[in-house]
């Protein structure tokens, strides 16, 4: 989920973004992001992954949203990404990463990989109608 955010990293690109640090902007975006994340979690099967990213520096839009999810969904856990460990957020012990402009990795942003604990259920069998679908007919029309 690349959630809409206050876009504080736009400033590092030289793009004006008035009000991006205002509490109303960061708080409103954090609330909207939580709604998006909660909806995304409903689509996540056990054993599935959700990558959460923003292009902002605001903790309420980043680490605090992750902690919000973990508190309400004990079946979730953060996943350590070894390649990102140099960018581990100092604001939480969870596996959250902040890439800042001074790291040389662009204008900055935040990311966290979430995992829903459990085994993936087996895929249901395909319906007979799908198995009987005439793929060969479509292939002959393409050639």
Tell what function each PLM region has:
Residues 1-143:
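SAM-dependent transferase fold signal centered on methyltransferase-like domains
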């Amino acid at each position: 989920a690349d959630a809409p955010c206050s876009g504080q990293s736009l400033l590092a690109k030289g793009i004006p973004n008035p009000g991006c640090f205002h509490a109303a902007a960061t708080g409103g975006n954090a609330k909207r992001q939580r709604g998006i994340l909660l909806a995304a979690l409903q689509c996540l099967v056990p054993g599935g992954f959700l990558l959460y990213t923003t292009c902002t520096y605001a903790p309420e839009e980043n680490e605090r949203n992750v902690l919000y999810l973990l508190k309400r969904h004990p079946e979730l856990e953060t996943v350590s990404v070894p390649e990102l460990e140099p960018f581990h957020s100092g604001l939480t012990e969870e596996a959250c990463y902040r890439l800042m402009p001074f790291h040389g990795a662009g204008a900055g942003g935040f990311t966290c990989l979430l995992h829903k604990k459990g085994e993936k259920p087996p895929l249901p069998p395909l319906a007979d109608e799908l198995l009987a679908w005439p793929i060969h007919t479509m292939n002959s029309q393409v050639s």
